[in-house]
Amino acid sequence: MDFSVQQADRETSARLGRLSTAHGEIDTPAFIPVGSLGSVKGVDPADLEQLGFRLVLNNAYHLYLRPGHKVVAEMGGLHRFTGWPGAILTDSGGFQIFSLAKLCKVTDEGVSFQSHLDGSTHFITPETAIEIEEALGADIMMAFDHCVAFPAEREVVRDAVRRTTLWAQRCQASRRRTDQALFGIVQGGLDADLRLTSARDLIGLGFEGYAVGGLSVGESKAEMYAMLDVTVPELPASKPRYLMGVGMPEDLIEGAARGIDLFDCVVPSRHGRTGSLFTSVGRVVIKQARYVRDEQPIDPACGCPVCARYSRAYLHHLFQVKEMLSSRLNTIHNLWYFADLMGQVRSAIAQGRLRSFREEFYRSCVRTSLDASAVDVAEVDLHRHAPDGTSRMLKKEVG
């Protein structure tokens, strides 16, 4: 894997980059669709290619349980097994173990837990996590980390940071393959000092990339962005920076402006299945009765194949009668929206107008968001660290 910064924004910490892997190149900032079980729900690899995606996420925890990492290896690895020709990133599964598994017990040696599927007992160490990820054969692997629940006492978070560093060292030491990149994951909760400690410890281990983990777990938008303001400037500018599990549209813009290169989230597919559709002026909740005779596409400004062919009325009908096609079409539209949004972000960075793009985004979308969190975002000052090291503020006034 190789990463290069093509252009840095003068007004924010955003940058254009290119991530090169054995399975293709990814222009950054980029959004990564999530296919935890080996597929992005509702779509196939050809759909993802046509939508412009070149990198997807699979989850090692889920694939370890079913069908098993050894089965995937016997089938030629994830690329051959899933039919996806692009790049793949595997999450180590640490977050899923702590959030899904039953009777989870953590020690410095590893984590014992019961499967959320059948109650079977398992013990995962950093060494076995790497063994699993190497068997799966993704282009990018994530180190095994300890993500604590939110909120948590400072001593609990401190211990998780210590353990994350210990496990990261063991992950590095246990690597056998040289054709896969390994990213370290910064933890630290909402404690700025612990975030810095975690980042500096991991940088000392020399990973090929660095992720910011443990966010979007219940904290406010302002708190999340404050942790990015602390953490991202500490990370090496020459390495890709990945914000894990964060993917609302405003988060992509705010994260990119702070120097994040990669994002992943289940939002496009999960919201699609529940009938929440992203548009250039906010979200459409397609189950609402107002759409029963609406001949318009989801978004007249959208260029996706769903908006080119189907009306809101038809999509409302499909959702109401629980047709499988509903989830598929909704997900395709949402994925198109996210791919297009990231394309607009990259264009704005290239043209030196990310600040004005951000402001226009809030003017068009913030008042029609389904939740109040976007309003909070618009009122948050965007701290930036310019290339010359100075700090500035980008403030959006909600009109």
Would you name each region that the model predicts?
Residues G24, V56, D91, E133, ...:
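Conserved, mostly hydrophobic/aromatic
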Residues G137, A168, Q172-R175, G206, ...:
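Structural signal for hydrophobic packing residues in well-ordered secondary-structure cores
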Residues F150-P151, R158, G209-L215, M324-S327:
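Glycine- and acidic
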Residues T128, I132, D159-R170, T197, ...:
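A non-catalytic, amphipathic alpha-helix used as a structural packing/dimerization or gating element
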Residues R162-T165, S174-I298:
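Glycine-rich phosphate/ribose-binding loops and adjacent secondary-structure elements
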